[in-house]
């Protein structure tokens, strides 16, 4: 009976946390809406930076290669975090963890070779 009571208190504290987090978020949103200023002038949707009206066209076109490089960076950065976590727990994981990390690194290298092969990392098109 005591074990069930402890389990209920753990769930109850988690539910309190969720409830108060949602309440606090809704309270902050409502407060900002209630206290925030409202501008109904014609300049409301005019873009500006530091109080200065922009000159020229504000729509810039970037090459898709910038986005590809950013996506590749994020992907390989996340894998670096996984490898860091593995290196911290290498003593506890033993040989099985070493083999799994080796397979993971091999998949990373294969994906990098695939990106080089399809020329996804080439900046200049031929």
From Swiss-Prot:
Record's catalysed reaction(s): a quinone + NADH + 5 H(+)(in) = a quinol + NAD(+) + 4 H(+)(out)
UniProt keyword NADP, yes or no: no
Localization terms from the record: Cell membrane
GO molecular function terms listed in the Swiss-Prot or TrEMBL record: NADH dehydrogenase (ubiquinone) activity; NADH:ubiquinone reductase (non-electrogenic) activity; quinone binding
Matches recorded under Pfam families: Oxidored_q4 (PF00507)
Domain of life the protein comes from: Bacteria
Cellular component GO terms, alphabetical: NADH dehydrogenase complex; plasma membrane
Predominant cellular place of this UniProt entry's protein: membrane
EC number in record: 7.1.1.-
Ranges annotated as spanning the membrane: 14-34, 66-86, 96-116
Membrane topology: Multi-pass membrane protein
UniProt keyword list: Cell membrane, Membrane, NAD, Quinone, Translocase, Transmembrane, Transmembrane helix, Transport, Ubiquinone
Reported function: NDH-1 shuttles electrons from NADH, via FMN and iron-sulfur (Fe-S) centers, to quinones in the respiratory chain. The immediate electron acceptor for the enzyme in this species is believed to be ubiquinone. Couples the redox reaction to proton translocation (for every two electrons transferred, four hydrogen ions are translocated across the cytoplasmic membrane), and thus conserves the redox energy in a proton gradient.
Subunit structure: NDH-1 is composed of 13 different subunits. Subunits NuoA, H, J, K, L, M, N constitute the membrane sector of the complex.
UniProt family annotation: Belongs to the complex I subunit 3 family.
Protein's name in the database: NADH-quinone oxidoreductase subunit A
Organism: Buchnera aphidicola subsp. Schizaphis graminum (strain Sg)
Recorded name of the encoding gene: nuoA
